[in-house]
């Protein structure tokens, strides 16, 4: 998670939770048209009205705090079936599930890994890949998503 994403998470967690939702994570994607993507969840699931409510709340906070200096589009959504993973708690919660990882720095000459989350120990996760346990530092994970099975 980038410094900006950490700052945004700290700034937006309380307003999102005040509406009764969990702030799952934040992604800021820089580009010609930058995007601030906010993932929310609740025990009852998420619908379009929930996303609109959070979008209005987040917009109000962002207008006051103004932490992003470039133009951007705001997207609020549920994590979906291919839920992104942002924290050690997410990996712990989904132990036993399949995850796809993209690493910042290669491990064994690979940046992309897919396997079953076996364990979480502090800032390290163990993933079983093709029958072998591999250990990754959370700080080295650039992107992680659950792999849905239909």
Curated annotation (Swiss-Prot):
Disulfide bonds: none annotated. The keyword Glycoprotein does not apply. InterPro entries: Ribosome_maturation_RimP, RimP_C, RimP_C_sf, RimP_N, RimP_N_sf. Keywords: Cytoplasm, Ribosome biogenesis. One of its GO terms (biological process) is translation. It comes from the Bacteria. Its main location: cytoplasm. GO terms for cellular component: cytosol. It is found in: Cytoplasm. Required for maturation of 30S ribosomal subunits. Belongs to the RimP family. This is Ribosome maturation factor RimP. The gene is rimP.
